[in-house]
UniProtKB/Swiss-Prot annotation:
Record's protein name: Protein P54
Organism, scientific name: Enterococcus faecium
Region named Disordered: 208-397
One GO CC term, this protein: extracellular region
Keywords from the named record: Cell wall, Hydrolase, Protease, Secreted, Signal, Thiol protease
Length: 516
């Protein structure tokens, strides 16, 4: 009996042990998975905290840039005051110069009529005594020295004013360059912050467990990625604008160099022709005194030389005309060739005029031929086919209602300037233009000046119409932007301490415009 009971107890123990071991193993496995998940969540939280720290560091850099910008703008304000003071000094100096101008001119005329040495002699000879003579000489010396000092002082004052103006302009250019660099740096920081926002939302999406929260985070991630892509596209367009500006500058320098070389070649050719013509004329005059046979031979030689020179002159004139039509203005290339004799001048002018007339006639004939060919081309009229009335199409991309843009911009007259501001609580120049276009068209033209250069077609300031953008600075390195009102006016957020207002190109002239 006891043995049977003992066997039953042992059998039960074995059975319980067999069942409990898998349960314990499963519990241990769950604990391990929970620990792993906790570790993963902790790692994600650490990564998210690190990303947040980087974002905060970048925000600190943006704040530092804001401070630097404020310092630069304060310096600009100081420079404007110094410039105003300098203008007043120049005005006062000019008034003093005008008051003394009559006296200086009178003394200059007297000095030309009577030289100083004779005046001194007259003073001595007409003196009543030796003391009188000495007094007169001293008085004349004092007057002459005073006049010389006066002229010298005026000269020194003018030089000092010019030096101050040059220094002031250099400082203003330096500040403009610094502002352009700040705009570029602001764009880089925005791009980095967008990248970090993508990282942060990605980590948050991995950490989220609830589907609704995860979906919301994924949406934010998609928005951040879209913002990242937009800023990268803006950076690409900005780089493209910089490269295009550099290419245009290189092409302009090449054209100017070619024009300078052409002008130099023409000048050398004209000088050579003048020298040879003068030598030929002088030689003919001297040889006319020789015997008849010698005169005949030398005259023949002179005529041949003159004919060759005139041909060279005509060729040079033709080349100069061709160069003028392609690259160089007329005023910078045309030079008159002086002649020492009537015959050489008449011959040269005749050849030049003939070449010019021939070139003009050829151009006219070609133009007439082209016009005739164009007029002879007849395009058959297409057969009209009835079509249903189309539905009104939206404005194409790049076509903007200028009146609507201007009306929206006028709503924010008086809004204070805030560097980096992008809403009606405060605008900077590019934030103002971006906000206005976003409200009217729903289009984001970029958060700083350089991407906004690529928002349309580059045109001259005189071609700008209402609603177009006006830029200050070179393409790819602009530092200010405004909205054109037409008629030489624009609306912009100017600088700290001022509000959104209307300005005029007469007082603050932009460098180029972009047609929207």
């Amino acid at each position: 009996m006891k043995k049977s009971l003992l066997s039953a107890v042992m059998l039960s123990s074995i059975a319980l042990t067999a069942v409990g071991s898998p349960i314990a193993a499963a519990a241990d496995d769950f604990d391990s998975q929970i620990q792993q998940q906790d570790k993963k969540i902790a790692d994600l939280q650490n990564q998210q905290a690190s990303a947040q720290s980087q974002i905060e560091a970048l925000e600190g850099q943006v704040s530092a840039i804001n401070t630097k910008a404020q310092d630069l703008l304060t310096k600009q304000d100081t420079l404007r005051k110094e410039s105003a003071q300098l203008k007043q000094e120049i005005k006062d100096l000019q008034e003093r110069i005008e008051k003394r101008e009559a006296t200086i001119q009178k003394q200059a005329r007297e000095t030309q009529v009577k030289n100083t040495s004779s005046n001194y002699i007259d003073a001595v000879l007409n003196a009543d005594s030796l003391a009188d003579a000495v007094g007169r000489i001293q008085a004349m010396s004092t007057i002459v020295k005073a006049n010389q000092d006066l002229v010298q002082q005026q000269k020194e004052d003018k030089q000092a004013v010019e030096a101050k103006k040059a220094e002031n302009e250099a400082k203003q250019k330096e500040l403009a360059d610094n502002q352009a660099a700040l705009e570029s740096q602001k764009g880089d920081l925005l791009a980095k912050q967008a990248d970090l926002n993508v990282l942060k939302t990605s980590l948050a999406a991995e950490q989220a467990t609830a589907e609704d929260k995860k979906a919301d985070l994924n949406r934010k991630k998609a928005e951040a990625e879209a913002e990242q892509a937009r800023i990268r596209e803006q950076a690409r367009l900005a780089e493209q604008a910089r490269q295009q500006a550099a290419q245009e500058k290189a092409e302009k320098e090449a054209r100017e160099q070619a024009a300078a070389q052409a002008a130099q070649t023409q000048a050398l050719s004209s000088a050579s022709t003048t020298t040879e013509s003068s030598s030929a004329a002088q030689s003919s005059s001297e040889e006319s005194k020789a015997p008849e046979s010698s005169t005949t031979e030398e005259s023949t030689s002179t005529e041949s030389s003159t004919t060759t020179e005139n041909s060279s002159t005509g060729s040079s004139s033709t080349e100069s005309s061709s160069t003028e039509e392609s690259t160089v203005p007329e005023s910078s290339t045309q030079e008159s060739t002086p002649a020492n004799t009537e015959s050489s001048s008449s011959s040269s002018n005749t050849n030049v005029n003939n070449n010019t007339n021939n070139s003009t006639n050829n151009s006219t004939n070609n133009s007439t031929t082209n016009n005739n060919n164009n007029n002879n081309t007849v395009t058959p009229a297409p057969t009209p086919t009835p079509t249903p009335a189309p539905a009104p199409a939206p404005n194409p991309s790049g076509s903007v209602n200028g009146a609507a843009i201007v009306a929206e911009a006028y709503k924010y007259i008086g809004t204070p300037y805030v560097w980096g501001g992008k809403d009606p609580s405060g605008f900077d120049c590019s934030g103002f233009t971006r906000y206005v276009y976003l409200q009217v068209t729903g289009r984001d033209i970029g958060g700083w000046t350089v991407p906004q250069e690529s928002a349309g077609t580059k045109i001259s300031v005189s071609q700008a119409k209402a609603g177009d953008l006006l830029f200050w600075g070179s393409a790819g390195g602009t530092y200010h932007v405004a909205i054109s009102l037409g008629g030489g006016q624009y609306i912009h957020a100017p600088q700290p301490g001022e509000n959104v207002k209307v300005g005029s190109v007469q007082w603050y002239t932009p460098d180029f415009a972009v047609s929207m």
